[in-house]
Amino acid sequence: HRSAETAALPNWAVWKDEAFGTSYEPAAIVYNKRLLPAEKVPDTHAALIALLDEQPAQLRGRIATYDPERSGLGLLLHSQDAQANPIVFWQLARGMGQLGLEQHATSSDMLDRVAAGKLVLAYNVLGSYASKRAQRDPVLGVIWPQDYTLVLSRVAFITRGARHPAAARLWLDHLLSTRGQALLAGHLGLLPVRGDAGTADSAAALLHHNLQHAFRPIRIGSGLLAYQDQAKKQGFLRQWAAATRPLP
């Protein structure tokens, strides 16, 4: 579908006029402010690795992330994380695993456990969920890593067998328009892909400004399907399981 609205989208959010990013979702680190003092809060992946090394007693059994075996989103985030910085990612995976890493299927589960004080922090949590929860629960802190913050997007496309393709094209154009994007932000609290869909002090604009060079979008394309290959998927899961195995 050749939409006139795609000219306003970033290059990473469009693939062959077939798939379109509609909103973006940064991956955050969430922590309990009562359990982790401000001077210990890590602002990069390296700082998080250092924290794991320095505070093993405090963090043992009290850190979490997605389970890539139960969560397709977790598989996407972890595999893209491994591509973004393989040395740091696998070092982090081993560090978390040695301390008894909890693995969950949803961001909501992790946020609940961090807020309740059962976890000190959770890694690779969906950013919009974390920010929205932190607004009403002041015990939660949200970190956007300043070395790189992975950003994924919600993707819309028209299937080849769509029963009403003309209506689908109209809906997609609306979804990608300035008004449609503003509605996503205002009514659903999502971060619109279009830079002109909000004000200069909108959540999306402020986040993009704060991240600047650390903003690391996951490009929409055929590469996202790589782990649909079962051999590749199982290879990654085996490597993940080995890296996150707790110390005896």
Question: Can you annotate each of these PLM segments?
Answer:
Residues 28-35, 77-79, 153-164, 183:
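A bilobed periplasmic-binding-protein/Venus flytrap-type ligand-binding module shared by bacterial periplasmic
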Residues 115, 121-139:
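A ligand-binding cleft/hinge motif common to bilobed small-molecule-binding domains
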